Amino acid sequence: MGHDVRLTASDGFQLGGYRADSVGPAKGALVVIQEIFGVNHHIRNVCDRYASEGYVAVAPSIFDRIEPNFQSGYSPDEVAVARKFVANPNWDAMLRDVQAAIDSVKDVGPVGIVGFCLGGSVAYVAAAKLSGLRAAVGYYGGAIVRFAD
């Protein structure tokens, strides 16, 4: 249903992502933030399901600055590799990349953000610091407590 896209952050960095356009008139847009496993089949499926409900959904590849197009499965070995990406995250860079995703869909209508695991924490911080968001949902964002103040 969706397709790969290129997004440009405010510092000029180009990152990949996945975009699924709404079936029928768009109700708005959602930025979908990945778990530590990248924009893999699961995150693409989440975007496709939101699109089937009438939302444009875009998932920025927030690890592209470290390893372009990183995607992982869920085996113990793959989890160990994926965890290396979050050992010392660059929050400023991730937020620039998320803002690029927000900007890419802001013409659609109201924009919300939803994230899972690391993405849940990113969604929380994005809602507090970035422009253009009307709603945010963070699922099991373990790093949220670091930003509670």
Language model features by range: what are they?
Residues 1-149:
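N-terminal cap/leader regions of alpha/beta-hydrolase-fold enzymes
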